[in-house]
Amino acid sequence: MIIQKSREEIELMRESALIVSKTLGMIASEIKEGVTTLHLDKLAEEFIRDHGAVPSFLGLYGFPNSLCMSPNAQVVHGIPNNKPLESGDVISIDCGAFKNGYHGDHAYSFEIGEVAPETKKLLQVTKESLYVGIRELKLGNRVEDVGNAIQKFTESHGYGVVRELVGHGLGQKMHEDPEMPNYGKRGRGKLFVEGMVVAIEPMINLGTKNIKQHKDGWTITTADGKPSAHFEHDVAIIDGKPEILSTFAYVYQALGIVSNEEDEFRRIPLVI
């Protein structure tokens, strides 16, 4: 069952989402060649707690850390470790924060040093596909309309769309209805409703769509060992239209990137 949120609840969720956004921005200022993912994980936990929140992922289903950190051929759910990042790596960093009874949850894929052109393009297309999908989150549409848009856009570039891992509803629980696949057929799935909040998160592979699970029980990797990309936003339906509650603006500020990609999804301009 889709849980509709009041405007007041959505604003509480926006606060949680923006703590995640700020955490990713802090990570963006620290991430570089030679830094370990475990070090970044500890920084993130401290940052989240300093902002009056609790890391959503720490202990969730038994997960041991605050961040899911998935480099290169890892798709999602990578466990932070002491291996230094290297030039040429790409890494998905997925973060969650729980405050005022509600979760925020979103992700960004970072480039470390000089990244191969084909991998840079994968990240660009995957991020673009996130917004292609978000445009379909509106009254009158259904769940698979979002997935269909993401699938068509990314497969047109020859990429593999992961099937087994999906986005999800978000609220007082980290994972609520509905599941939000990144593939599908138009006109299928649950009908969208006012006040719903979902995490839309394309997970797109440079090669095959197939994945496998690491022996640690968490880490998901591409079956062919080629890179994967992952971007995620929290999005509400307000007045029948999609509104992004999270933002990449803090990441962009740290990286010196200028972008207006989120502007069409905001009723009120974001001030950072």
Tell me the role of every PLM-derived stretch:
Residues 1-272:
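Active-site neighborhoods and metal-handling regions in enzymes and metal-associated proteins
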